[in-house]
């Protein structure tokens, strides 16, 4: 027997028993985003490597350690580690944002070569939202309200907490960086080699360290909010006022900086403790300089992304009222001379006349006992039964699989009217 081939570590299959929950979550995402007037876009999963180096920052962990990169002839290409850079590239390339505002969203797989752990994998799926051309804090508030509405639709709103911060302008961050480095240089004995490297290359990333001793030291570190420029401070204060007005609770987290270099002003995360250690469900912020950095006109921008794997785990943990199996409504069984053709015609008629119902046709043979076992296993509400006598009499037997009336016989011409009364 040939040796079987396994999935690559950190890249997982989604089983038939798991996909209904994914589909339900994705449907809630689409419904909420469409209700706010956002438009879906689709980008390639492979981009030119320099796109991410320029957008995310060469000293970030993502670019320096985690990207899947390869050569195609003389061009270096990368499996996308996130969606914002590709969306900005597409917006510039196709002129979507020239003298125009856009509210866009996308969904799809991303790739990072990091240590797989619960809810975080090397191939993972993200929903991303990007807004171009709006500078005021009202759009910051709208994105946060949009995510909160999605949490309510998913039944997880009581299990997530909003954390906010402002990281100001590039100049304000540079001033803060100097103050932070000056403070941390006296505590290098508490740092790992990786943290010492971050102190030199990207010191703001030390603020979200998991090192408990260093976390205690950081409680007394300079606060980024104390170094904000006046414009960023006013922007942040207005955002907080808008959230207060609509009743969205938040915590100001002065250590929140996000992991990518393109952010400025507002940054936010929705976090949860329902999965054990506190983890991020959704994160985003402003990146007003990124469009120009990638060759476009100066364009104020903001966005967020949420990981679907982490979201699936959270919904499973806290919301018992979610679908756990495919929604088959009607299962058609048949046996005997002439029954195959009638059953096929019946199944197609139901699909045509009642397209909102999911109709499964038994195609693997066997006696009625075997077929009804399959029908029960499918979770269908009704079975439509065609045997030799039903073929001769132009009838169909309706069997209730989830309790209620046991079964009844109807003329085939009346079956659609009957099904409309049942669903």
Curated annotation (Swiss-Prot):
Cell location: Cytoplasm
Pfam families: HGTP_anticodon (PF03129), tRNA-synt_His (PF13393)
Keyword match Ligase: yes
Gene name, Swiss-Prot/TrEMBL: hisS
One GO CC term, this protein: cytoplasm
Keywords from the UniProt entry: Aminoacyl-tRNA synthetase, ATP-binding, Cytoplasm, Ligase, Nucleotide-binding, Protein biosynthesis
Database matches in CDD domains: HisRS-like_core, HisRS_anticodon
Complex and partners: Homodimer.
GO BP term, pick one: histidyl-tRNA aminoacylation
Keyword Cytoplasm: yes
Xref: SUPFAM superfamilies: Class II aaRS ABD-related, Class II aaRS and biotin synthetases
Similarity-based family: Belongs to the class-II aminoacyl-tRNA synthetase family.
Enzyme class: ligase
The name this protein goes by in its record: Histidine--tRNA ligase
GO molecular function, one term: histidine-tRNA ligase activity
HAMAP family, alphabetized: His_tRNA_synth (MF_00127)
Domain of life: Bacteria
UniProt EC number: 6.1.1.21
Catalysed reactions, as listed in the record: tRNA(His) + L-histidine + ATP = L-histidyl-tRNA(His) + AMP + diphosphate + H(+)
